[in-house]
Design a protein with these regions (language model features):
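Binuclear metal-dependent hydrolase catalytic cores
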Residues: 1-147, 154
Length: 154
């Protein structure tokens, strides 16, 4: 399983770093939608994209506006943004407001509680984290295991 770090900067990007965005290309999973989302198109492997948001602070969601370009240049069967209800409502109400970004890209929003849910072959377990305004962390169980027998012989 390959994990690609697209952004790790704090509240705003700088010349060398984008804001929070991590991708697992072979699953089409993205963790947080910071400004690193602008590099997503080159890394997409399949025809689905699932974005898991930790919270609604701008450095974690601004990249959702880049979905407009991605949906035009890539033929994706489905784009789903996952988050708790309050996070998704804040995005719909504020980020995609008429005054800020009046064109909403074509994607579904899927709200969840803290109960585990499934996307494809992966079981996702959300868990609350300590962060101003609240935040969600994720555990992904995707049936992936490494062959480690060589390590045990060392």
């Amino acid at each position: 399983m390959k994990i690609v770090v697209l952004g790790t900067a704090g509240y705003h990007p700088n010349e060398t770093r984008d804001t929070s965005c991590i991708m697992i290309p072979e699953l089409g999973f993205v963790l947080d939608a910071g400004t690193g989302m602008h590099r997503l198109g080159k890394l997409l492997v399949g025809d689905t994209l699932d974005i898991f948001l930790s919270h609604a602070h701008l450095d974690h969601v601004f990249g959702l506006t880049f979905l407009l370009g991605i949906s035009v240049t890539r033929s994706l069967r489905r784009i789903t943004v996952h988050g708790i209800g309050a996070t998704l409502q804040a995005i719909d109400r504020h980020l995609y407001s008429e005054a800020l970004f009046p064109v909403r890209p074509n994607f579904n929003m899927q709200a969840f509680s803290t109960d585990p849910f499934t996307v494809g072959d992966c079981r996702i377990t959300p868990m609350p984290l300590a962060h101003p305004g609240g935040s969600i962390g994720y555990r992904f169980d995707c049936g992936f295991i490494c062959e480690l027998s060589a390590l045990w012989k060392m």
